[in-house]
């Protein structure tokens, strides 16, 4: 009697999904690591899942990393926001980027993170890389006071001109009266 090779059990949908996830995860990891190698600047890349990754970068390398992300298919900014860390007197600025044109990346979001100090809250604008950064950078400037150098139009979106030097999303901002706005005579 000859021995026949043992047949592999059929894969169940969960196993197939796990294999597909590993393939896509490795694809995202591979793309980001290739980008990191080509850049030759210090960045910290963390792939959190098959569709989420975070890149931490010094503000001096922000523009180079953004251009590299653009070159591998991340073609727009979804959101721009900031986090205020008063204990270290820093702001962390976050850009969430994705793709409309690359089907593989369309469901992927990469968060590009960088820090600026209270003493020098300036960053290069990423509007030249992604026009979709336009409104998010304006809002972050208005609400946190972070300047985006090279942005073509850093003017107010929501607040009245009387709010000059007042940044309501900073943790140091306190509302002094009930409600934010005071009725004024017409």
Please place each PLM-identified region on the residue numbering:
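Terminal low-complexity/charged segments
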Residues: 1-186
